[in-house]
């Protein structure tokens, strides 16, 4: 099946859907979400992106999420989460 690139605080993995969901669930269980603000977003032809700041109980993170179009729907291609002082 399709894989997604996850880069969470410099730890990178190329994961299938189930592994990616587990990795994201573990991150969010350790970082209770307060809010998420979108800073930039865009779409062009077969791809798109969202960049924002995730505010959690354990600090703020810059989130980059990249999409690509597959059979007329957008799927997540890459998620990058990095600690930030923003």
Q: Where are the model-predicted features located?
A:
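Short, well-ordered coil loops that connect the C-terminus of an alpha-helix to the N-terminus
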Residues: 2-3, 33
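Short beta-strand edge/turn micro-motifs at domain boundaries
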Residues: 60-86
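A short gly/proline-enriched turn/hairpin at secondary-structure junctions
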Residues: 3-13
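Surface-exposed, charged secondary-structure patches
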Residues: 20-60
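Acidic surface patches and DE-rich sequence motifs
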Residues: 8, 56, 70
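Solvent-exposed, acidic/flexible segments
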Residues: 13-20
């Amino acid at each position: 099946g399709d894989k997604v690139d996850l880069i969470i605080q410099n730890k990178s993995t190329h994961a299938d859907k189930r592994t990616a969901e587990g990795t994201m669930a573990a991150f969010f269980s350790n970082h209770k979400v307060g809010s998420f603000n979108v800073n930039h977003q865009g779409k062009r032809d077969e791809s798109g992106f969202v960049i924002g700041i995730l505010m959690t109980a354990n600090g703020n993170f810059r989130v980059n999420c990249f999409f690509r179009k597959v059979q007329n729907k957008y799927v997540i291609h890459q998620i990058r989460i990095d600690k930030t002082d923003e």
